[in-house]
Amino acid sequence: MNDLLRILREQITSFPLILRLAAYETKSKYQMNYLGVLWQFLNPLIQMLAYWFVFGMGIRKGGPVTTGAGEVPFIIWMLAGLIPWFFISPTILDGSNSVFKRINMVAKMNFPISSLPSVAIASNLFSYMIMMVIYIIVLLVNGVFPSVHWLQYIYYFICMIAFMFSFSLFNSTISVLIRDYQFLLQAVTRLLFFLLPIFWDVNAKLGQSHPELVPVLKLNPLFYIIEGFRNSFLDGAWFFHDMKYTLYFWLFTFLLLLVGSILHMKFRDKFVDFL
């Protein structure tokens, strides 16, 4: 428990430097390109249009989706899950590689290594925030107006950040110790894309044909986050309506953070030896 508290204190005390490093990393990543940081938004935008064309216009033939807010265009329903995924997916990979990638740099600085996963999270947040603003505009244009349920977006955002930090702290340590783990994580991330309720309503599609699979898919904490964002904007369901699932998510996140903190503190002084 002491390791966990120390890790959290390091995030708080290093917060200003985390933001500066994240901003620097974002700029340096695109500085050699003509369009610069604009690619941070163009790339997911192109993917959004491709997915909408294939799944919305192709498979669904342009049909609307029925939600708690009434019938809405498929693209609105899709983006509610896809935009969080565009943050989650690169953060999983960047966070897992954050210590291995920057250990030599921070070894010369008065900067806690445990904050490196936070830098990866913060750098991906810039484009995520822009995409969320665009999404809200799209909602308003299509007649989906703010309701009291929108307030719980803040709650699910906190859930997402808490889980991503816990997951990244754990993964960043394992990735240094076992380099093959990074390749495994890439494969799992690609698989998760199709197992999450991004393009399909799991409860509706599997609820009747294979109801036993629904609880299994919901064991994934990312399922809770993706479904929560959609509930906030479209379905009008409160997170406390399913307290067992909420408690499961936070217990899973806490245990992951605890294990990640213990492993990180145990090996942090030996990270350089594994490079």
From Swiss-Prot:
Keyword ATP-binding found: no
Single biological process term from Gene Ontology: lipopolysaccharide transport
Gene Ontology cellular-component terms listed: plasma membrane
Keywords for this protein: Cell membrane, Membrane, Transmembrane, Transmembrane helix, Transport
GO molecular function: ABC-type transporter activity
Membrane topology: Multi-pass membrane protein
Family annotation (InterPro entries): ABC2_TM (IPR013525), ABC2_TM_bact-type (IPR047817)
Pfam annotation, one family: ABC2_membrane
Source superkingdom: Bacteria
The keyword Transmembrane helix belongs to this UniProt entry's keyword annotation: yes
Main location: membrane
Subcellular location: Cell membrane
All residue ranges annotated as the ABC transmembrane type-2 domain in the record: 35-267
TM stretches of this protein: 35-55, 72-92, 125-145, 150-170, 183-203, 245-265
Subunit-structure text: The complex is composed of two ATP-binding proteins (TagH) and two transmembrane proteins (TagG).
Protein name: Teichoic acid translocation permease protein TagG
Gene name for this UniProt entry: tagG
